[in-house]
Amino acid sequence: MTLDKGQKFSAKHGPNAQADPIIKDKVNKHAAQGKLPCAVAFKIADELEVSPAEIGKTADLLDLRLSKCQLGLFGYQPAKKAVKARAPENRQLEDAIRKALNDGKLACSDAWDIAGRFKVPKMAVSGACESLNIKIKPCQLGAF
């Protein structure tokens, strides 16, 4: 769901959505300047044994902006995006990306899995997707 200009992130979840108090407290402790970095969100999810989506939802309900996507897709300054298009390192990597596509898109979780399987940085996978004109969606945190 995209937001209209000036709309708060919490609007994505409806007026009755509530944040879990334990998650809310942990997210608030780690947020700085209205932002929560992707890596920190995943660390919190791991510590609390909840899904990354729960952390993303809580960040939304607190109207925090997610930053520094580990795939380099959003949250960087000044360009917003850190990833650069880069040809896949090998044919097997490209094949794995193409095999994991769903409706022409690669899920963020699949990008992470592929990076782990091939022992390459996450941005190597997202860079390959950029060069292949493949969108990465959905985000595990719910950013897109």
Predicted regions and their residues:
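Long, charge-rich, low-complexity intrinsically disordered regions
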Residues: 1-144
